[in-house]
Amino acid sequence: FAVAAPMGEDSGWNDCRSDASDNPSGDDVAFIGAMIDEIAASYGIDASRVFATGLSNGGHMSIRLAEEAPDLIAGFAAVAAADSAASECTSSQASVPALFMNGSGDGLMPCDGGAMANGAMVFSSEETVARWVERNGAVAEPTVETVEDVDPDDGSTVMISRYAAGPGGAPVV
């Protein structure tokens, strides 16, 4: 497999959050689409098997790709990111396999929703997952797994909720 790690304008991405004080103005969806085309042409990758992922602003950009250009990606993983409560994206409503990884102790991306450090408002992690479960036509009841706590002294635990793809839909984790 191949990994491409692009950097957005001014080290950030124009990621749909219209109320974020630090959002650049570039057309990052077009930039990433052109990057995928160039890499596919130059290195022979299968453009139908491209996945997007990112942390924080990069996670929000992955969400934007899924919303506005689902034909560019086969799925996405958003880390420390949630749906914008003040989105300027135009959503296609297409089903896109989704993975969200958020932590309840994150001081920048509030797991319970609300204002981020840059002033942008986001839905809670739970609301974001529910929105994608509905959008993707996933099964409403998840399979829940609690990961073994290998270090009980670190104060953290991991829970995985898997929403299977419904007929014609896509899964959400």
Regions found by a protein language model. Give the residues of each.
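Active-site-adjacent mobile loop/cap segments within catalytic or ligand-binding domains
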Residues: 173
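Primarily recognizes the serine-hydrolase "nucleophile elbow" in alpha/beta-hydrolase
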Residues: 40-42, 47-96, 107
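Serine-hydrolase catalytic machinery in alpha/beta-hydrolase-like enzymes
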Residues: 1-51, 60-68
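The feature captures the conserved acid-bearing segment of alpha/beta-hydrolase catalytic domains
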Residues: 74-156, 161-168
